[in-house]
Amino acid sequence: MNGYEAYMKELAQQMRAELTDNGFTSLETSDDVNQYMQNIDNDDTTFVVINSTCGCAAGLARPAAVAVAEQNEVKPDHKVTVFAGQDKEATQTMRDYIQQVPSSPSYALFKGQHLVHFIPREHIEGRDINDIAMDLKDAFDDNCQ
């Protein structure tokens, strides 16, 4: 591993911890993603954060995801994350389940293996964090019972 890769791995670990320290399960391999998705109960909801090292992930996506997942009255059954640019195979496998244009950071909400809501980067970047949180709240309220 060269110096740049080592630096990015260390930096990404802190960014990953912002989610895992708040109850998100990190899926770091393609097998992790497939095992999770293939074994999820059809009635369970899963909130997926596709994490990223960019500024909008740090200042908007991760804080909004954590706040709403912890504070909203209606919560998904499960919270998972993959890290774009770091866990490339895991991210691609999750994107195969999502079946939307690749976007990071982004959010996906599943019921079983069925995608019920998706928020791409362009609906995160440049927006007020409270607006993003309200989008997540509405998605949880509509789909997580």
Curated annotation (Swiss-Prot):
InterPro entries: BrxB/BrxA. One of its GO terms (biological process) is cell redox homeostasis. It comes from the Bacteria. Gene3D superfamilies: Glutaredoxin. It holds the Pfam family Disulph_isomer. NCBIfam families: YphP_YqiW. Belongs to the bacilliredoxin family. This is Bacilliredoxin SERP1006. The lineage of its organism: Bacteria, Bacillati, Bacillota, Bacilli, Bacillales.
